[in-house]
C-alpha cells in the first residue's frame, strides 16, 4: 500500500527564491527511506507539506490513496502519520510526561482510562516508565527526544516522519533511539545529517537538490 505520494511539489516562501521546484516522492507501507540534502534545501518544508501544515504553490499530496487538498483532508493524515519535529520543545507542551503522551489519545476520543493505559504501554515498551511523572521542561535534551517519540507512538501511526531525530542526543541515547526505531513496524521517512544513523535505520536514500528529489 502506498502511504504517501508527493507529485511535482513546488513551494516558495514569500519574497524568497523557490525551495521546492517539482519534488516528487513515494513512501510504501513498511518502507524506510532517508532524504539527504544541505541545510535550507527544503526537507522540513516537504514534511510539513506532506501533513498539510503548509500549502504547496503547486503539485499534489496523496495519502492512503486519496488526494489531500484542504485542511479537513489532512485530519486523517495527521492521525495516521506521525511527525517527530526537529526541536522537541515544539512538540512537548503539557506539564508532565504522562500528560504529554495522553494528549494524543484523548484528542482521538479515547477515554481517560484508555489514554492512561496507552501511556503505560508506550513508556513500558520504550523502557521509559521512570519518566512518567517527571516535569517535561526539566528533562534533558535526550530525554525530551525520546518522550517526543513516545507521544507520537501513542497515536498508533502507520508511518513516521523523523526530522533530525538525533539532535541533542548523546551517544547512549542515540543508540537507544536507533534500537527503538529499528524494532518498530511503521514505515519511516528520515531526515538526518548523521550518516551512520541513516545507514543503520533507513539506508535507501534520495537527495533533495535544487528543489527536486533525485
Question: What role is predicted for each listed range?
Answer:
Residues 1-6, 10-22, 71-73:
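A short, flexible loop at the N-terminus of ABC-type nucleotide-binding domains that lies
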Residues 36-38:
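The feature captures the beta-strand-to-loop junction immediately N-terminal to the Walker
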Residues 51:
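Helix-to-loop junction immediately C-terminal to a conserved catalytic motif
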Residues 59-69, 77:
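Conserved ABC transporter NBD signature motif
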Residues 113-131:
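Conserved ABC ATPase "signature" region
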Residues 135-139, 143:
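Conserved ABC ATPase signature
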Residues 160-163:
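Catalytic Walker B motif of ABC-type/P-loop ATPase nucleotide-binding domains
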Amino acid at each position: 500500500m502506498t502511504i504517501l505520494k508527493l507529485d511535482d511539489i513546488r513551494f516558495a516562501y514569500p519574497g524568497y527564491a523557490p525551495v521546492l521546484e517539482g519534488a516528487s516522492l513515494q513512501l510504501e507501507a513498511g518502507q524506510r527511506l532517508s532524504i539527504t540534502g544541505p541545510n535550507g534545501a527544503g526537507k522540513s518544508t516537504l514534511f510539513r507539506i506532506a501533513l498539510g501544515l503548509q500549502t504547496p504553490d503547486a503539485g499534489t499530496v496523496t495519502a492512503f490513496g486519496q488526494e489531500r487538498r484542504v485542511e479537513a483532508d489532512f485530519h486523517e493524515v495527521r492521525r495516521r502519520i506521525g511527525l517527530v519535529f526537529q526541536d522537541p520543545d515544539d512538540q512537548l507542551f503539557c506539564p508532565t510526561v504522562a500528560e504529554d503522551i495522553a494528549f494524543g489519545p484523548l484528542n482521538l476520543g479515547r477515554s481517560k482510562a484508555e489514554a492512561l493505559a496507552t501511556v503505560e504501554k508506550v513508556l513500558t515498551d520504550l523502557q521509559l516508565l521512570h519518566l512518567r511523572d517527571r516535569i517535561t521542561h526539566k528533562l534533558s535534551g535526550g530525554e525530551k527526544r525520546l518522550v517526543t517519540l513516545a507521544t507520537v507512538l501513542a497515536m498508533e501511526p502507520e508511518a513516521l516522519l523523523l526530522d533530525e531525530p538525533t539532535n541533542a542526543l548523546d551517544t547512549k541515547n542515540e543508540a537507544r533511539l536507533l534500537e527503538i526505531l529499528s524494532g518498530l513496524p511503521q514505515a519511516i521517512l528520515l531526515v538526518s545529517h548523521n550518516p551512520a544513523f541513516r545507514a543503520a535505520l533507513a539506508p535507501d536514500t534520495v537527495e533533495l537538490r535544487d528543489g527536486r528529489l533525485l
